[in-house]
């Protein structure tokens, strides 16, 4: 450290000053001796007496200080000693000596080259007692001290001297104290100050742990120090630090954390303010009280709920206080005989919680609603009575013609803590006539080798007049894979044609006007052993009889297959009171033959849908969003994750709340239809949900939606080959349906779905119906909506639908595809379309439509349905076009495509017309002749100038004839210029 010393050497006195600023003493240094701080004389021992001399001066702050100097440079063999007083070492083991001094350059003193020195020696001696007599040999040399800078005569003249600072280590020291000694051997030196100190690691707080002053033990190792936690904190990991020999703290390990109700602020743990809390020990900060809670004092670990607000026992303190929800709203009941479906809306006020559930309280009431009692334990709730998470429940097994009141409680996690009354909504209903209860016992009366006679008691609760009983039986070993159903009017029956020595399983259920009751439990009975054997004398007779029977059966089956009269089951009358039906898996099927079964023939739609569709667990279905609304409810997109299978995207149709039984039957009917189809161009049914609400139909998800919307969105973006590929897929799907004997009735581009690979699939089977046994027979509808613009003339006129009428609709779909989703007959009303089609008007070819495709459209639009191609032929035609793309380059001529006009399939030669009447007859608009007779448009020349408004004035108001006449007029103009043009 360089400072400047201004000194006056006069009569042994000097004044010291320093032009530089002194650094403050570090906090980790503890002084044992500092000569500058001693008031008065230092009193150190100087030997010999004419050696070191104590003088007074002032420092840079003009504070008086005592210093020692010596300058015996003229004499040889100088040995001047200066010893300090005894210095206690306290706890130090290693001490540091800091010397500040000035030293005269020997070269600046004349005649002293042989005797002048520029160094002095530093010594020390340990001692347990002070007052020890000075003896040179007892001291141990620490070091020889030399000046970094010395002063000259010139410096003396300027009174500016340079101050040197040197620090030396001493130790380890073991005794209670020590002396320092300075030996001069002939230098001109002044000791400005002497400071003796040791280093310590000072008190500090680290990681909320306090570490005390610590003195290093030796010069080699670190001292491990255990910290103690500050107030209102506790150890998380034991806090430790290491004190180095340089008095520095190193390597903090572990820490303390503030207690609950306190947070770290600097080096302390401070209590949370009112309105804030901290629930647990740790480094977290105090948090503001959650809604509807507060604190009034410092250091709170949780917040108290406001009046009428609560926090459940397991709720974390950070959760807002809540209250019970309000009552459910908009309760709707849908009664079905002795069951009821209850639907309701969520409470307006959830109380601030999401864990809302619903409990159903059932009460059976007399005609006076106030006189009620709890319902019988036999009443069932689906999915359950308590803890419902959805807003619907089905209640079954109610008594017929009985009043019930249902109270729907809304509860959440704090409802049990609240004292206010229950929050519920109530609805009262009266049940209708119910199906009969099960037959409880079946008794075996007689048994033979091939028959069993059974009897049973009427159900305990018939709930009406028993119409008949259904007896279902099958061989036990077949496990219900093939069963027989027999109907009986009484409570007994004899089943014959059984196998000897065979166990059969029987179930019986009763039927009333309200429908079938549930099946009885299963009863097992065994026929008698077979004691009959074929002897030698009659074996040939038996073999002939068996052969004849087999031949008759085979012939009967073949006949049924050829005429298409096989209906899935065999009927035969056994008596006036019994009917027998035999099923294989519910329907008898022949290898290689797949026939569509109309689900509407089933009395119970649920039985039909379970026959053809897979029941899904609603928990495996997740709904993402609502994408539209259908006839029966919402249409959603979502995901289906079946066990051991990959999650797939699906479309979900739901049955709306408050449905009628007919709507439910139609809804499940559509699923029963789809479930019978398995073709890459038919929408695939993934399954149904009928055992929970809402009921759902789950199908594969088609990313691009309906074909018409998709084409409009991507107008003119596909090649002709791509469009033909789409059409080929639709035709292939329709061929599959036709082969199954199935009529769609609503084939349109809006009912074709397209996926991301541009694969088209037929969908929407809401209007579909089954064909009769004759493949060319028609199903006559009983009314309902018909899509006029897509429907064939015979279907519009006579309500008769066949596969040929589907071919007509396919022609319209073909037109929609080639026009990129335009609406057919877009400028015409439905009535105009019906009249125009009946008069043989047809849609014009779309822009740039290949002639081969337009010809296929016209073939599909033949008035005689027998002249239309079959779907098999359409698939073949499209395959040929795909294999020969050059044939698609021939575009329909402009002459055959008047702009925005319908095109008559008949070619009219205008040159053959001589009068207006001939012309109108040629266009099949003879009914307009009387209108034009007697008016100014009585000749071809005058009528060529007619406009649409002019036709309306004279009475031609139907759009079809209007457009036909205008089209022919344009052709007439072309004829007058270029010759005849076909129209």
UniProtKB/Swiss-Prot annotation:
Record carries keyword Thylakoid: no
Assembly mode: Heterotetramer upon binding of the ligand. The heterotetramer is composed of an ephrin dimer and a receptor dimer. Oligomerization is probably required to induce biological responses. Forms a ternary EFNA5-EPHA3-ADAM10 complex mediating EFNA5 extracellular domain shedding by ADAM10 which regulates the EFNA5-EPHA3 complex internalization and function. Interacts (phosphorylated) with PTPN1; dephosphorylates EPHA3 and may regulate its trafficking and function. Interacts (phosphorylated) with CRK; mediates EFNA5-EPHA3 signaling through RHOA GTPase activation.
Active-site residues per Swiss-Prot or TrEMBL entry: 746 (proton acceptor)
Similarity field: Belongs to the protein kinase superfamily. Tyr protein kinase family. Ephrin receptor subfamily.
Name under which the protein is recorded: Ephrin type-A receptor 3
Taxon lineage: Eukaryota, Metazoa, Chordata, Craniata, Vertebrata
Motif placement: PDZ-binding: 981-983
Topological region Cytoplasmic: 565-983
Domain SAM span(s) in chain numbering: 911-975
């Amino acid at each position: 450290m360089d400072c400047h010393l201004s000194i006056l050497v006069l009569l042994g006195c000097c004044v010291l000053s320093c032009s530089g600023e002194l650094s403050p003493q570090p906090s980790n240094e503890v002084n044992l001796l500092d000569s500058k701080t001693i008031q008065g004389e230092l009193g150190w021992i100087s030997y010999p007496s004419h050696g070191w001399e104590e003088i007074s001066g002032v420092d840079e702050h003009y504070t008086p200080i005592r210093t020692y100097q010596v300058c015996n440079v003229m004499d040889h063999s100088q040995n001047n000693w200066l010893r300090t007083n005894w210095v206690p070492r306290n706890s130090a083991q290693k001490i540091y000596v800091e010397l500040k001094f000035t030293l005269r350059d020997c070269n600046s003193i004349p005649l002293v080259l042989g005797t002048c020195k520029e160094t002095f020696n530093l010594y020390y001696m340990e001692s347990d007692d002070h007052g020890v007599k000075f003896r040179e040999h007892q001291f141990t040399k620490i070091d020889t001290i030399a000046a970094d800078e010395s002063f000259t005569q010139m410096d003396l003249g300027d009174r500016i001297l340079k101050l040197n600072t040197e620090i030396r280590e001493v130790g380890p020291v073991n005794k209670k104290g020590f002396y320092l000694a300075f030996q001069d051997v002939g230098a001109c030196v002044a000791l400005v100050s002497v400071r003796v100190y040791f280093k310590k690691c000072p008190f500090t707080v680290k990681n909320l742990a306090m570490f005390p002053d610590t003195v290093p033990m030796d010069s080699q190792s670190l001292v491990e120090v255990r910290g103690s936690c500050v107030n209102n904190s506790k150890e998380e990991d034991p806090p430790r630090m290491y004190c180095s020999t340089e008095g520095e703290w190193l390597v903090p390990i572990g820490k303390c954390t503030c207690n609950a109700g306190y947070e770290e602020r600097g080096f302390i743990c401070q209590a949370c303010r009112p309105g804030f809390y901290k629930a647990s020990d740790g480094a977290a900060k105090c948090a503001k009280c959650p809604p509807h809670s507060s604190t009034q004092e410092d250091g709170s670990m949780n917040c108290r709920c406001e009046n009428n607000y609560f926090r459940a026992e397991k709720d974390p303190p950070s959760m807002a206080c809540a209250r019970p929800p309000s009552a459910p709203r908009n309760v709707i009941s849908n009664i079905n005989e002795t069951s009821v479906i209850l639907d309701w809306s969520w409470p307006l006020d959830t109380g601030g919680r999401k864990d809302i559930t619903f409990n159903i309280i059932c009460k059976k009431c007399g005609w006076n609603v106030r006189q009620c009692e709890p319902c019988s334990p036999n009443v069932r709730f689906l999915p359950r009575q308590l803890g419902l998470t959805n807003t619907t429940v089905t209640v079954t097994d109610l008594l017929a013609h009985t009043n019930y009141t249902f109270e729907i409680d809304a509860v959440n996690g704090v409802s049990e803590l609240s004292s206010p009354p229950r929050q519920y909504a109530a609805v009262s209903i009266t049940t209708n006539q119910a199906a009969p209860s099960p037959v409880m016992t079946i008794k075996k009366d007689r048994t033979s080798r091939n028959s069993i006679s059974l009897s049973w008691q009427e159900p305990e609760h018939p709930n009406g007049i028993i119409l008949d009983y259904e007896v279902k039986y099958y061989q036990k070993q077949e496990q219900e894979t093939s069963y027989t159903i027999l109907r009986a009017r009484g409570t007994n029956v004899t089943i014959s044609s059984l196998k000897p020595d065979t166990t059969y399983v029987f179930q019986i259920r009763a039927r009333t006007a309200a429908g079938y009751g549930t099946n009885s439990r299963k009863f097992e009975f065994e026929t008698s052993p077979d004691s009959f054997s074929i002897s030698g004398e009659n074996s040939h007779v038996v073999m002939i009889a068996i052969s004849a029977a087999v031949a008759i059966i085979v012939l009967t089956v073949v006949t049924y297959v050829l005429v298409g009269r096989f209906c899935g089951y065999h009927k035969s009358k056994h008596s006036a009171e019994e009917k027998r039906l035999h099923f294989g898996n519910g329907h008898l099927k022949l290898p290689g033959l797949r026939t569509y079964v109309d689900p509407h023939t089933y009395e119970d739609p649920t039985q039909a849908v379970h026959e053809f569709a897979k029941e899904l667990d609603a928990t495996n279905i997740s709904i993402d969003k609502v994408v539209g609304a259908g006839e029966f409810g919402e249409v959603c997109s979502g995901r289906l994750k079946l066990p051991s299978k990959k999650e797939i995207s699906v479309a979900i149709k739901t049955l709306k709340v408050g449905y009628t039984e007919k709507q439910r039957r139609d809804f499940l009917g559509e699923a029963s239809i789809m479930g019978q189809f398995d073709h890459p161009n038919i929408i695939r049914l993934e399954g149904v949900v009928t055992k929970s609400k809402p009921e759902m139909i789950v199908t594969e998800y088609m990313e691009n939606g309906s074909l018409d919307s998709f084409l409009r969105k991507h107008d003119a973006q596909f090649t002709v080959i791509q469009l033909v590929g789409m059409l080929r897929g639709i035709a292939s799907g329709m061929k599959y349906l036709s082969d199954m004997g199935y009529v769609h009735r609503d084939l349109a581009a809006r009912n074709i779905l397209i996926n991301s690979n541009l694969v088209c699939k037929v969908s929407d089977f809401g209007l579909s119906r089954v064909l009769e046994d004759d493949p060319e027979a028609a199903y006559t509808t009983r009314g309902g909506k018909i899509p006029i613009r897509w429907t064939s003339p015979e279907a519009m006129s006579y309500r008769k639908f066949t596969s040929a009428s589907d071919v007509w609709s396919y022609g319209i779909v073909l037109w929609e595809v080639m026009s990129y989703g335009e609406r057919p007959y877009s400028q015409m009303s439905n009535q105009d379309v019906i009249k125009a089609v009946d008069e043989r008007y047809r849609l014009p070819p779309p822009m740039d439509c290949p002639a081969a495709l337009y010809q296929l459209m016209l073939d599909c639009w033949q008035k005689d349905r027998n002249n239309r191609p079959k779907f098999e032929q359409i698939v073949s035609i499209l395959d040929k076009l795909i294999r020969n793309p050059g044939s698609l380059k021939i575009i329909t001529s402009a002459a055959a495509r008047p702009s925005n006009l319908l095109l008559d399939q008949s070619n009219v030669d205008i040159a053959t017309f001589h009068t207006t009447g001939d012309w109108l007859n040629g266009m099949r608009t003879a009914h307009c002749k009387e209108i034009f007779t007697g008016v100014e448009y009585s000749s071809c020349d005058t009528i060529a100038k007619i406009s649409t408004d002019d036709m309306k004035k004279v009475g031609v108001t139907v759009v079809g004839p209007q457009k036909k006449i205008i089209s022919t007029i344009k052709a007439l103009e072309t004829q007058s210029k270029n010759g005849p043009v076909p129209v």
